[in-house]
Design a protein with these regions (language model features):
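Short, surface-exposed patches at the edges or C-terminal ends of soluble domains, predominantly
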Residues: 1-286
Length: 286
């Protein structure tokens, strides 16, 4: 076999590998690299926002909102300092958190907000699923403008601050998981979204809003409008990508994720196609 044949097929194999990297992913919940139903790939592809991995990049920001999806709560003192300065500069933080991992951070920031992990259920639900509950705006705020109802999947309870969104009266904390409101489980409205008194920190006790299955279904209540409001809280949307579950990609998945950037794929394709063309023309002339 001639040398140009070897080079040609070698580049062809490389092109296939690049395509495989681009379309591969993982199955980690909320991961940006998870293209399955429980990933957040669709939201991140559409958001097109600046990714924050180094908290020093928060300094000097104006009129910006930092979005944190399921943060792990393992913040360093320098990161907390950066967040405090970020808020002092008049910016906003939106946190979606079901298990309550952000409670320590919320306390340090002095927000008075927290998440109480709970099996919040309701007969006012979508698809006759008591865990797929419908929630309603409770007080006026820009984040709920044009929103009449939102469907959330297995939310917890948001506490403190000003309640902005609640479940209906036909809701209860299903402590025993039997899907029924027992005598020891009183009915009542529960908050699923709150904000601090300063109007700078928002807390949503559910992150399913951003997963592919729900985000991709544009006709699900007013979920799409709600997400657009979140993204439009400020002129600039920044997406936290150091502690958020969206960044979950260990080992090879993390490497593949880094290679999946649009610029890398475009440059790789251009180079490979150019070389393949040159080799093909060179081989034809021989």
């Amino acid at each position: 076999m001639r040398s140009w044949h070897i080079a040609f097929f070698g580049l062809l194999i490389l092109a296939l590998l690049v395509a495989d990297v681009h379309f591969s992913g993982n199955d980690t919940e909320f991961s940006r690299y998870n293209y399955n139903w429980n990933g957040t790939s669709q939201f991140y592809d559409d958001a097109g926002s600046e990714i924050i991995t180094d908290y020093s990049n928060l300094y000097g920001r104006k009129n910006s909102t930092l979005l944190m999806i399921e943060p792990d709560g393992k913040f360093t003192s320098s990161e907390i300092t950066a967040l405090m300065r970020f808020l002092r500069d008049g910016n906003k933080i939106f946190i979606s958190d079901e298990p309550g991992n952000s409670n320590t951070l919320l306390g340090i920031l002095g927000t008075g907000l927290s998440v109480t992990p709970a099996n919040l259920s309701s007969t006012d639900s979508e698809y006759n699923n008591k865990r797929f509950i419908i929630c309603y705006p409770y007080k006026e705020d820009g984040i709920t403008a044009g929103v009449e109802s939102v469907a959330l999947n297995s939310p917890s309870v948001a506490e403190g601050g000003i309640s902005l969104m609640r479940s209906s009266f036909l809701s209860w904390i299903d402590t025993n998981g039997n899907g029924k409101a027992d005598a020891t489980e009183p009915l009542g409205k529960r908050s699923v979204m709150v904000r601090d008194e300063a109007g700078q920190v928002y807390l949503l006790s559910d992150s399913s809003l951003f997963i592919n299955r729900m985000y991709g279904y544009k006709r699900l209540r007013d979920n799409d409008r709600f997400i657009q409001n979140i993204m439009g809280l400020s002129d600039n949307l920044l997406v936290e990508y150091r502690h958020s579950a969206a960044a979950s990609a260990d080992g090879l998945s993390g490497i593949l994720g880094a290679l999946k950037s649009t610029d890398f794929i475009k440059i790789s394709v251009i180079i490979i196609v150019t070389l393949l063309t040159i080799l093909a023309l060179a081989g034809r002339d021989k």
